[in-house]
Amino acid sequence: MIEKRRSRIHGSGVYATQPIPKNKRIIHYAGEKISNRESLKRELRYIRKGHIWCFKLTNRTVIDAGVGGNVARFINHSCRPNCYIDIKNSVIWIRAARTIRTGEELTYDYNTDGDGLIKCRCRPGCQRLI
């Protein structure tokens, strides 16, 4: 249903290999469960390399896709995403916000609480910092 390839947005991306219907669960965001405190240390290392791989699950728990992650960590940010996040039973699911065409890159809004250290490249002219 999906595959990792080069992306125009940022490095690698995830693409649909077949049409994906609206609201379909596509993949879960996998990684090591760590404390919020530990994630602050790791995020600094990742951000220096231009990556955002820590996903806040709760106020105390973060999923670090840099350790034990799957291809979901390569789904890029977009200010106009075609996917959304759905957290069920402590599992972070990426779901289709609309029907996604074959060959289309999957994106979701990272909606970060960060310091705006990474320039958004979701489309030409986007000036947002994530």
Predicted regions and their residues:
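Conserved catalytic SET/PR domain of SAM-dependent protein methyltransferases, capturing the structural core
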Residues: M1-I130
